Amino acid sequence: MSVRDYSGVQVISSRKHRSMSRLPTVLLLLASAAVLAAGGQEATEDPFADETDQCQISVSAETMKSLHGGSMQPDGTCDNLWESFLSQFHQVRENLTACQERAAAGPAPDPSSQFCQQLLDDAQRQMEQEHRQYAATLEEQLHAAQQETQQEQEMKKALQKQLDALTDSRNALYIDLLLANIAIGETKQALSYYNLMPASMPIDKLHEQIVRFVYRVTIYQDQRLLNLMRFVRDIPSVEERRSLYQLAQREVQKRPSQRDGYVAAVYALSVREDLPVYQANRQLYDDLVRQSETRLKEQVANGNFKQAAELAARQPQHFRQLQTSLATIELKHWRKFDRFVPYANALPQPAQRLEVLRVLLSQIGDREKKTSHKYLVKAARQFDICEQFIGRGKVDQAVKKQLEELRGKFATFAKGKNYQHYLSESRKSSG
Protein backbone atom coordinates (compact mmCIF):
# COMPACT_ATOMS: atom_id res chain seq x y z
CA MET A 1 0.00 0.00 0.00
CA SER A 2 1.26 3.51 -0.85
CA VAL A 3 0.27 6.75 0.79
CA ARG A 4 0.50 10.23 -0.77
CA ASP A 5 -0.26 13.40 1.14
CA TYR A 6 -1.65 16.37 -0.84
CA SER A 7 -2.26 19.32 1.48
CA GLY A 8 -3.78 17.31 4.23
CA VAL A 9 -5.37 14.66 1.97
CA GLN A 10 -3.69 11.32 1.90
CA VAL A 11 -4.35 8.93 -0.95
CA ILE A 12 -3.47 5.40 0.02
CA SER A 13 -3.08 2.92 -2.76
CA SER A 14 -3.37 -0.69 -1.75
CA ARG A 15 -3.80 -3.85 -3.79
CA LYS A 16 -5.72 -5.40 -0.93
CA HIS A 17 -8.65 -2.92 -1.09
CA ARG A 18 -11.08 -3.86 -3.94
CA SER A 19 -14.32 -2.72 -2.47
CA MET A 20 -14.28 0.73 -4.12
CA SER A 21 -13.91 -0.17 -7.77
CA ARG A 22 -16.86 1.71 -9.25
CA LEU A 23 -16.17 4.88 -11.16
CA PRO A 24 -19.00 7.07 -9.86
CA THR A 25 -18.09 6.43 -6.26
CA VAL A 26 -14.43 7.25 -6.81
CA LEU A 27 -15.29 10.35 -8.79
CA LEU A 28 -17.44 11.49 -5.88
CA LEU A 29 -14.58 10.85 -3.48
CA LEU A 30 -12.14 12.67 -5.70
CA ALA A 31 -14.47 15.61 -5.98
CA SER A 32 -14.73 15.74 -2.20
CA ALA A 33 -10.97 15.43 -1.90
CA ALA A 34 -10.45 18.25 -4.32
CA VAL A 35 -12.75 20.47 -2.27
CA LEU A 36 -11.02 19.57 0.92
CA ALA A 37 -7.63 20.12 -0.66
CA ALA A 38 -8.71 23.55 -1.76
CA GLY A 39 -9.92 24.37 1.75
CA GLY A 40 -6.69 23.07 3.27
CA GLN A 41 -4.56 25.12 0.94
CA GLU A 42 -6.30 28.28 2.03
CA ALA A 43 -5.78 27.36 5.68
CA THR A 44 -2.03 26.85 5.31
CA GLU A 45 -1.59 30.41 4.17
CA ASP A 46 -1.93 31.52 7.77
CA PRO A 47 1.40 30.81 9.53
CA PHE A 48 -0.15 30.98 12.94
CA ALA A 49 -3.02 28.60 12.17
CA ASP A 50 -2.97 25.16 13.68
CA GLU A 51 -2.16 22.31 11.39
CA THR A 52 -5.29 21.15 9.62
CA ASP A 53 -6.61 17.73 10.13
CA GLN A 54 -5.41 15.30 7.57
CA CYS A 55 -7.91 13.15 5.55
CA GLN A 56 -6.87 9.85 4.23
CA ILE A 57 -8.68 8.21 1.28
CA SER A 58 -7.76 4.66 0.69
CA VAL A 59 -7.93 3.66 -3.01
CA SER A 60 -6.90 0.20 -4.01
CA ALA A 61 -4.43 -0.33 -6.79
CA GLU A 62 -7.06 -2.20 -8.82
CA THR A 63 -9.44 0.76 -8.59
CA MET A 64 -6.71 3.17 -9.64
CA LYS A 65 -5.88 0.91 -12.54
CA SER A 66 -9.49 0.64 -13.69
CA LEU A 67 -9.94 4.39 -13.44
CA HIS A 68 -6.82 4.90 -15.46
CA GLY A 69 -8.16 2.81 -18.26
CA GLY A 70 -6.07 -0.23 -17.39
CA SER A 71 -2.83 1.41 -18.54
CA MET A 72 -1.29 2.03 -15.08
CA GLN A 73 2.00 0.33 -14.60
CA PRO A 74 2.38 -1.70 -11.45
CA ASP A 75 5.39 0.24 -10.39
CA GLY A 76 3.99 3.69 -11.20
CA THR A 77 4.63 6.31 -8.62
CA CYS A 78 1.85 7.74 -6.63
CA ASP A 79 2.57 11.24 -7.94
CA ASN A 80 2.27 10.15 -11.50
CA LEU A 81 -0.87 8.27 -10.75
CA TRP A 82 -2.37 11.24 -9.07
CA GLU A 83 -1.47 13.66 -11.84
CA SER A 84 -2.82 11.33 -14.45
CA PHE A 85 -5.94 10.76 -12.44
CA LEU A 86 -6.53 14.46 -11.95
CA SER A 87 -6.09 15.07 -15.67
CA GLN A 88 -8.62 12.35 -16.40
CA PHE A 89 -10.92 13.76 -13.76
CA HIS A 90 -10.85 17.23 -15.29
CA GLN A 91 -11.50 15.79 -18.76
CA VAL A 92 -14.44 13.83 -17.45
CA ARG A 93 -15.73 16.95 -15.74
CA GLU A 94 -15.53 18.97 -18.95
CA ASN A 95 -17.30 16.22 -20.83
CA LEU A 96 -20.04 16.09 -18.24
CA THR A 97 -20.42 19.88 -18.35
CA ALA A 98 -20.70 19.79 -22.12
CA CYS A 99 -23.27 17.02 -21.89
CA GLN A 100 -25.23 19.05 -19.38
CA GLU A 101 -25.26 22.05 -21.70
CA ARG A 102 -26.37 19.97 -24.64
CA ALA A 103 -29.09 18.37 -22.57
CA ALA A 104 -30.33 21.78 -21.51
CA ALA A 105 -30.32 23.02 -25.12
CA GLY A 106 -32.17 20.00 -26.47
CA PRO A 107 -31.78 16.33 -27.19
CA ALA A 108 -28.76 15.38 -29.17
CA PRO A 109 -29.52 14.33 -32.72
CA ASP A 110 -29.45 10.71 -33.49
CA PRO A 111 -26.51 9.85 -35.77
CA SER A 112 -28.86 7.91 -38.02
CA SER A 113 -31.18 10.92 -38.28
CA GLN A 114 -28.20 13.12 -39.13
CA PHE A 115 -27.32 10.74 -41.92
CA CYS A 116 -30.89 10.70 -43.18
CA GLN A 117 -30.99 14.49 -42.99
CA GLN A 118 -27.85 14.68 -45.08
CA LEU A 119 -29.40 12.33 -47.64
CA LEU A 120 -32.59 14.41 -47.58
CA ASP A 121 -30.62 17.63 -48.05
CA ASP A 122 -28.68 16.09 -50.90
CA ALA A 123 -31.87 14.83 -52.50
CA GLN A 124 -33.50 18.25 -52.07
CA ARG A 125 -30.52 19.99 -53.64
CA GLN A 126 -30.57 17.52 -56.51
CA MET A 127 -34.32 18.00 -56.97
CA GLU A 128 -33.92 21.77 -56.95
CA GLN A 129 -31.18 21.51 -59.53
CA GLU A 130 -33.26 19.18 -61.69
CA HIS A 131 -36.24 21.50 -61.22
CA ARG A 132 -34.19 24.46 -62.39
CA GLN A 133 -32.96 22.49 -65.38
CA TYR A 134 -36.47 21.26 -66.16
CA ALA A 135 -37.89 24.78 -65.75
CA ALA A 136 -35.22 26.14 -68.08
CA THR A 137 -36.05 23.42 -70.62
CA LEU A 138 -39.75 24.17 -70.32
CA GLU A 139 -39.05 27.87 -70.73
CA GLU A 140 -37.16 27.19 -73.93
CA GLN A 141 -39.89 24.88 -75.18
CA LEU A 142 -42.55 27.44 -74.23
CA HIS A 143 -40.70 30.18 -76.04
CA ALA A 144 -40.32 27.96 -79.09
CA ALA A 145 -44.01 27.03 -78.89
CA GLN A 146 -44.98 30.71 -78.59
CA GLN A 147 -42.94 31.55 -81.65
CA GLU A 148 -44.46 28.64 -83.52
CA THR A 149 -47.94 29.64 -82.38
CA GLN A 150 -47.36 33.22 -83.47
CA GLN A 151 -46.19 32.02 -86.87
CA GLU A 152 -49.22 29.76 -87.16
CA GLN A 153 -51.52 32.62 -86.14
CA GLU A 154 -49.95 34.87 -88.74
CA MET A 155 -50.36 32.12 -91.32
CA LYS A 156 -53.94 31.63 -90.16
CA LYS A 157 -54.64 35.35 -90.50
CA ALA A 158 -53.13 35.35 -93.97
CA LEU A 159 -55.19 32.30 -94.97
CA GLN A 160 -58.32 33.83 -93.45
CA LYS A 161 -57.68 37.00 -95.40
CA GLN A 162 -57.33 34.99 -98.59
CA LEU A 163 -60.45 33.01 -97.72
CA ASP A 164 -62.40 36.21 -97.08
CA ALA A 165 -61.22 37.60 -100.39
CA LEU A 166 -62.28 34.41 -102.18
CA THR A 167 -65.61 34.43 -100.35
CA ASP A 168 -66.20 38.05 -101.33
CA SER A 169 -65.31 37.23 -104.92
CA ARG A 170 -67.64 34.24 -104.88
CA ASN A 171 -70.50 36.27 -103.41
CA ALA A 172 -69.90 39.03 -105.94
CA LEU A 173 -70.04 36.42 -108.70
CA TYR A 174 -73.28 34.99 -107.30
CA ILE A 175 -74.79 38.48 -107.24
CA ASP A 176 -73.69 39.16 -110.81
CA LEU A 177 -75.20 35.87 -111.96
CA LEU A 178 -78.37 36.58 -109.98
CA LEU A 179 -78.80 39.99 -111.58
CA ALA A 180 -77.92 38.72 -115.04
CA ASN A 181 -80.58 36.02 -114.84
CA ILE A 182 -83.17 38.54 -113.63
CA ALA A 183 -82.27 40.76 -116.57
CA ILE A 184 -82.91 38.00 -119.13
CA GLY A 185 -85.96 36.64 -117.33
CA GLU A 186 -84.45 33.34 -116.14
CA THR A 187 -86.19 33.55 -112.81
CA LYS A 188 -85.60 29.93 -111.74
CA GLN A 189 -81.86 30.21 -112.28
CA ALA A 190 -81.87 33.59 -110.56
CA LEU A 191 -83.62 32.04 -107.57
CA SER A 192 -80.93 29.33 -107.29
CA TYR A 193 -78.23 32.00 -107.03
CA TYR A 194 -80.40 33.98 -104.62
CA ASN A 195 -80.53 30.94 -102.33
CA LEU A 196 -76.72 30.67 -102.45
CA MET A 197 -76.29 34.04 -100.82
CA PRO A 198 -74.60 33.61 -97.42
CA ALA A 199 -76.65 34.10 -94.27
CA SER A 200 -74.07 36.64 -93.07
CA MET A 201 -74.98 38.99 -95.93
CA PRO A 202 -77.72 41.45 -94.84
CA ILE A 203 -80.81 40.60 -96.86
CA ASP A 204 -82.00 44.20 -97.01
CA LYS A 205 -78.70 45.24 -98.61
CA LEU A 206 -79.08 42.49 -101.20
CA HIS A 207 -82.63 43.61 -102.00
CA GLU A 208 -81.52 47.21 -102.42
CA GLN A 209 -78.78 46.08 -104.79
CA ILE A 210 -81.27 44.06 -106.85
CA VAL A 211 -83.69 46.97 -107.21
CA ARG A 212 -80.87 49.39 -108.10
CA PHE A 213 -79.81 47.00 -110.85
CA VAL A 214 -83.34 46.93 -112.27
CA TYR A 215 -83.24 50.72 -112.75
CA ARG A 216 -79.59 51.01 -113.78
CA VAL A 217 -80.39 51.30 -117.50
CA THR A 218 -83.51 53.33 -118.32
CA ILE A 219 -84.42 51.58 -121.57
CA TYR A 220 -84.45 48.19 -119.84
CA GLN A 221 -86.09 49.15 -116.57
CA ASP A 222 -89.66 48.23 -117.54
CA GLN A 223 -88.81 44.73 -118.69
CA ARG A 224 -86.46 44.14 -115.78
CA LEU A 225 -89.14 45.21 -113.33
CA LEU A 226 -91.57 42.74 -114.89
CA ASN A 227 -88.92 40.02 -114.62
CA LEU A 228 -88.34 41.02 -111.01
CA MET A 229 -92.04 40.59 -110.22
CA ARG A 230 -91.94 37.03 -111.57
CA PHE A 231 -88.76 36.36 -109.61
CA VAL A 232 -90.21 37.67 -106.35
CA ARG A 233 -93.21 35.33 -106.54
CA ASP A 234 -90.87 32.31 -106.27
CA ILE A 235 -89.06 33.46 -103.10
CA PRO A 236 -90.21 31.25 -100.20
CA SER A 237 -90.04 33.89 -97.46
CA VAL A 238 -93.11 36.14 -97.20
CA GLU A 239 -91.10 38.82 -95.42
CA GLU A 240 -88.44 38.86 -98.15
CA ARG A 241 -91.10 39.11 -100.86
CA ARG A 242 -92.75 42.00 -99.03
CA SER A 243 -89.38 43.76 -98.71
CA LEU A 244 -88.73 43.59 -102.47
CA TYR A 245 -92.29 44.70 -103.28
CA GLN A 246 -91.91 47.77 -101.07
CA LEU A 247 -88.57 48.75 -102.60
CA ALA A 248 -90.01 48.34 -106.10
CA GLN A 249 -93.10 50.40 -105.25
CA ARG A 250 -90.95 53.36 -104.19
CA GLU A 251 -89.13 53.31 -107.52
CA VAL A 252 -92.34 52.98 -109.56
CA GLN A 253 -93.86 55.97 -107.78
CA LYS A 254 -90.78 58.07 -108.61
CA ARG A 255 -91.12 57.49 -112.38
CA PRO A 256 -94.18 58.87 -114.21
CA SER A 257 -93.51 56.61 -117.18
CA GLN A 258 -94.10 53.58 -114.96
CA ARG A 259 -96.53 55.11 -112.50
CA ASP A 260 -98.91 56.21 -115.30
CA GLY A 261 -98.49 53.11 -117.44
CA TYR A 262 -99.14 49.41 -117.44
CA VAL A 263 -96.02 48.68 -115.33
CA ALA A 264 -97.70 50.04 -112.23
CA ALA A 265 -100.70 47.81 -112.97
CA VAL A 266 -98.46 44.75 -113.29
CA TYR A 267 -96.78 45.58 -110.02
CA ALA A 268 -100.07 46.05 -108.20
CA LEU A 269 -101.62 42.90 -109.67
CA SER A 270 -98.51 40.89 -108.74
CA VAL A 271 -98.92 41.98 -105.14
CA ARG A 272 -102.65 41.15 -105.28
CA GLU A 273 -101.88 37.63 -106.48
CA ASP A 274 -99.43 37.13 -103.60
CA LEU A 275 -102.13 36.56 -101.00
CA PRO A 276 -99.90 36.33 -97.85
CA VAL A 277 -98.20 39.61 -98.75
CA TYR A 278 -101.47 41.26 -99.76
CA GLN A 279 -103.19 40.27 -96.52
CA ALA A 280 -100.24 41.54 -94.49
CA ASN A 281 -100.10 44.89 -96.30
CA ARG A 282 -103.10 45.71 -98.49
CA GLN A 283 -101.84 49.24 -99.00
CA LEU A 284 -99.11 47.92 -101.30
CA TYR A 285 -101.89 46.88 -103.71
CA ASP A 286 -104.69 49.31 -103.10
CA ASP A 287 -102.68 52.53 -103.37
CA LEU A 288 -101.21 51.65 -106.74
CA VAL A 289 -103.76 49.46 -108.50
CA ARG A 290 -106.56 52.02 -108.26
CA GLN A 291 -104.33 54.77 -109.59
CA SER A 292 -103.04 52.56 -112.39
CA GLU A 293 -106.45 51.26 -113.41
CA THR A 294 -107.92 54.77 -113.44
CA ARG A 295 -105.11 56.09 -115.65
CA LEU A 296 -105.41 53.19 -118.11
CA LYS A 297 -109.19 53.67 -118.41
CA GLU A 298 -108.70 57.38 -119.06
CA GLN A 299 -106.17 56.61 -121.76
CA VAL A 300 -108.39 54.02 -123.46
CA ALA A 301 -111.45 56.30 -123.33
CA ASN A 302 -109.43 59.00 -125.10
CA GLY A 303 -108.22 56.62 -127.80
CA ASN A 304 -104.73 56.04 -126.34
CA PHE A 305 -104.40 52.26 -126.37
CA LYS A 306 -100.62 51.89 -126.15
CA GLN A 307 -100.26 51.09 -122.45
CA ALA A 308 -103.26 48.76 -122.39
CA ALA A 309 -102.02 46.96 -125.51
CA GLU A 310 -98.55 46.52 -124.02
CA LEU A 311 -100.07 45.14 -120.85
CA ALA A 312 -102.14 42.71 -122.92
CA ALA A 313 -99.12 41.66 -124.95
CA ARG A 314 -96.49 41.39 -122.20
CA GLN A 315 -98.60 40.34 -119.25
CA PRO A 316 -101.73 38.62 -120.60
CA GLN A 317 -102.48 36.97 -117.24
CA HIS A 318 -102.44 40.29 -115.44
CA PHE A 319 -104.35 41.95 -118.29
CA ARG A 320 -107.09 39.37 -117.93
CA GLN A 321 -107.79 40.73 -114.44
CA LEU A 322 -108.37 44.24 -115.85
CA GLN A 323 -109.69 43.61 -119.36
CA THR A 324 -113.39 43.84 -118.45
CA SER A 325 -112.83 47.02 -116.46
CA LEU A 326 -110.78 48.61 -119.25
CA ALA A 327 -113.40 47.67 -121.86
CA THR A 328 -116.15 49.33 -119.83
CA ILE A 329 -116.56 52.99 -120.80
CA GLU A 330 -117.58 55.26 -118.00
CA LEU A 331 -120.75 57.19 -118.66
CA LYS A 332 -118.92 60.50 -118.69
CA HIS A 333 -116.81 59.23 -121.59
CA TRP A 334 -119.64 57.60 -123.60
CA ARG A 335 -119.77 60.51 -125.97
CA LYS A 336 -116.20 59.58 -126.97
CA PHE A 337 -117.45 56.26 -128.36
CA ASP A 338 -115.85 56.86 -131.75
CA ARG A 339 -112.42 57.16 -130.11
CA PHE A 340 -112.93 54.16 -127.92
CA VAL A 341 -114.40 51.57 -130.32
CA PRO A 342 -111.10 50.79 -132.19
CA TYR A 343 -109.67 49.62 -128.87
CA ALA A 344 -110.91 46.07 -129.51
CA ASN A 345 -108.56 45.49 -132.44
CA ALA A 346 -105.61 47.17 -130.73
CA LEU A 347 -105.15 44.09 -128.57
CA PRO A 348 -102.88 41.22 -129.63
CA GLN A 349 -104.95 38.12 -128.86
CA PRO A 350 -108.30 37.01 -130.38
CA ALA A 351 -109.86 36.26 -126.99
CA GLN A 352 -108.91 39.74 -125.76
CA ARG A 353 -110.53 41.40 -128.77
CA LEU A 354 -113.70 39.37 -128.47
CA GLU A 355 -114.00 40.28 -124.78
CA VAL A 356 -113.89 44.00 -125.64
CA LEU A 357 -116.58 43.52 -128.32
CA ARG A 358 -118.76 41.55 -125.90
CA VAL A 359 -118.58 44.29 -123.24
CA LEU A 360 -119.11 46.96 -125.91
CA LEU A 361 -122.30 45.34 -127.30
CA SER A 362 -123.57 44.86 -123.75
CA GLN A 363 -123.10 48.57 -123.00
CA ILE A 364 -124.86 49.57 -126.24
CA GLY A 365 -127.83 47.44 -125.21
CA ASP A 366 -127.91 48.96 -121.75
CA ARG A 367 -127.39 52.59 -122.71
CA GLU A 368 -128.63 53.02 -126.30
CA LYS A 369 -131.35 50.45 -126.86
CA LYS A 370 -133.53 52.83 -128.87
CA THR A 371 -130.71 54.67 -130.59
CA SER A 372 -128.34 51.79 -131.02
CA HIS A 373 -128.08 51.86 -134.80
CA LYS A 374 -125.09 54.17 -135.21
CA TYR A 375 -123.22 52.44 -132.41
CA LEU A 376 -123.87 49.00 -133.91
CA VAL A 377 -122.64 50.15 -137.32
CA LYS A 378 -119.33 51.18 -135.81
CA ALA A 379 -119.18 48.00 -133.73
CA ALA A 380 -119.88 45.86 -136.83
CA ARG A 381 -116.90 47.44 -138.56
CA GLN A 382 -114.61 46.43 -135.67
CA PHE A 383 -116.18 42.96 -135.54
CA ASP A 384 -115.36 42.46 -139.22
CA ILE A 385 -111.72 43.41 -138.61
CA CYS A 386 -111.58 41.02 -135.65
CA GLU A 387 -113.10 38.20 -137.70
CA GLN A 388 -110.51 38.66 -140.45
CA PHE A 389 -107.73 38.67 -137.81
CA ILE A 390 -109.00 35.43 -136.33
CA GLY A 391 -109.32 33.88 -139.77
CA ARG A 392 -105.63 34.46 -140.47
CA GLY A 393 -104.50 32.44 -137.50
CA LYS A 394 -105.08 29.19 -135.74
CA VAL A 395 -107.63 29.44 -132.95
CA ASP A 396 -109.37 26.93 -130.74
CA GLN A 397 -113.03 26.06 -130.85
CA ALA A 398 -113.85 28.24 -127.85
CA VAL A 399 -112.80 31.35 -129.76
CA LYS A 400 -114.80 30.33 -132.82
CA LYS A 401 -117.83 29.65 -130.67
CA GLN A 402 -117.57 33.04 -128.98
CA LEU A 403 -117.20 34.70 -132.38
CA GLU A 404 -120.47 33.16 -133.60
CA GLU A 405 -122.28 34.12 -130.39
CA LEU A 406 -121.25 37.75 -130.82
CA ARG A 407 -122.30 37.69 -134.47
CA GLY A 408 -125.78 36.65 -133.39
CA LYS A 409 -125.84 39.36 -130.73
CA PHE A 410 -126.25 42.04 -133.46
CA ALA A 411 -129.65 40.62 -134.40
CA THR A 412 -131.08 41.16 -130.91
CA PHE A 413 -131.20 44.95 -131.11
CA ALA A 414 -133.70 45.56 -133.94
CA LYS A 415 -136.07 43.24 -135.68
CA GLY A 416 -134.90 42.19 -139.14
CA LYS A 417 -131.45 43.66 -138.71
CA ASN A 418 -128.49 41.38 -138.21
CA TYR A 419 -124.74 41.64 -138.33
CA GLN A 420 -124.57 41.75 -142.13
CA HIS A 421 -126.98 44.68 -142.18
CA TYR A 422 -124.86 46.75 -139.84
CA LEU A 423 -121.66 45.73 -141.65
CA SER A 424 -123.11 46.91 -144.97
CA GLU A 425 -124.08 50.20 -143.36
CA SER A 426 -120.53 50.62 -142.05
CA ARG A 427 -119.06 50.06 -145.49
CA LYS A 428 -121.42 52.62 -147.00
CA SER A 429 -120.51 55.23 -144.44
CA SER A 430 -116.82 54.64 -144.93
CA GLY A 431 -117.28 55.13 -148.66
UniProtKB/Swiss-Prot annotation:
Keyword match Metal-binding: no
Annotated compartments: Secreted
Keywords assigned by UniProt, alphabetized: Coiled coil, Glycoprotein, Secreted, Signal
Residues modified by glycosylation: N95
GO CC annotation terms, alphabetical: extracellular region
Coiled coil: 120-169
Expression across tissues: Female salivary gland (at protein level). Not detected in female carcass without salivary glands, midgut and hemolymph (at protein level). Probably not expressed in male tissues.
Residues of the signal peptide: 1-39
Keyword Lipoprotein included in the entry's annotation: no
Disruption phenotype: No significant effects on mosquito fitness. No significant effects on blood feeding behavior of female mosquitoes.
Quaternary organization: Homodimer.
Physiological role: (Microbial infection) Facilitates efficient midgut colonization by Plasmodium berghei parasites. Promotes successful transmission of Plasmodium berghei at low infection densities. (Microbial infection) Facilitates efficient midgut colonization by Plasmodium falciparum.
The name this protein goes by in its record: Saglin
The gene coding this protein: SG1f
